[in-house]
Swiss-Prot record:
HAMAP family on file: Pterin_4_alpha
EC code(s) of this entry: 4.2.1.96
Official protein name in the record: Putative pterin-4-alpha-carbinolamine dehydratase
InterPro entries the record matches: PCD_sf, Pterin_deHydtase
GO molecular function: 4-alpha-hydroxytetrahydrobiopterin dehydratase activity
Lineage of source species: Bacteria, Pseudomonadati, Pseudomonadota, Betaproteobacteria, Burkholderiales
Amino acid sequence: MSTEFPMRIGAEVALPALQGWNAAAGRDAIEKRYRFDNFNAAFGFMARVAMFAEKMDHHPEWRNVYNRVDVTLTTHDAGGVTELDVRMAQFMDEAAGRLGATGLPARADQPRT
């Protein structure tokens, strides 16, 4: 990755290009919850995304509980959402779709059980 930081575009600009993603509460970030058939599929998704993240040198904030993966994307160096986050979100949606996941918006009013 170059030494130049990506330009911040903000969640409000990024979200129209993405399906099922929401603005995170209290910060310039986007988030989504994926639900898979089982833990193996969820972990397989995370492994695939981890390899892509390493290539991009851009890493998600995420949490896995059984068949769910909750994801938050932001570019810390830029102080908010950038094109890197949009690219990562699009890759995640494609990878999740190949594994039969359903994407559920990760919202503060949804229980994270």
